[in-house]
Amino acid sequence: MPAAERIGGSVNVPRIPAGTPHRGNPILQRIMIALLRLTGWRFTGTDFPDVPRMVLIVAPHTSNWDFPLGVMAMYALRIRGTYLGKHTLFRFPLGILMRFLGGVPVDRGSSQDVVGQTVAIAQGMDRAIIVLAPEGTRKLAPKWKTGFYRIAQQGGMPIFPVAFDYARKEIRFFPPFHPTGDLEADLAALRANFTPQMARYPAQYA
């Protein structure tokens, strides 16, 4: 995206398509941009997709710091992401904060699997950004979980890969990826965007 279409100076915040789920306000946006600038982070990569629904995957996920960084990024972009959490975590009082930040409870013991629940949640929204960490854990995970892929495939949504590159302090956007149905080939193509050197703790990303 041309520099003239970005805001936030060195933080390089991309313009977001008008139909994207929004949250926050200009004042909070400026505060988050200032925090990103203060800590040396900036946005790089492709445009933000202009699609009704997407599965946004964030990797590498090796640190508790990924969550506050993600919150700062979402408010700097003024987008509303929807993430999933175990339904028991949404009890009072923690549930208030989790819902405020875009959390949606899912019941893993339900007769409807988590993939089905998530697809139903996304299809129940006019526009949705489903945010997932494909590793499913901060610990070393040689293989990615496949739930995000099945959600995208069953929901007819593109996968939008985003890297938290701690080495370069970049929140990097990659081109949207449309599942082909070849799981192994598609996972390999998606994983090629990410390297251990990007991670906060490289030894915890394979």
Q: What is each PLM-predicted segment?
A:
Residues 1-2, 164:
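Accessible peptide chain termini
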Residues 2-43:
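Extreme N-terminal tail/first-helix region
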Residues 21, 38, 42-196, 201, ...:
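Soluble catalytic domains of membrane acyltransferases
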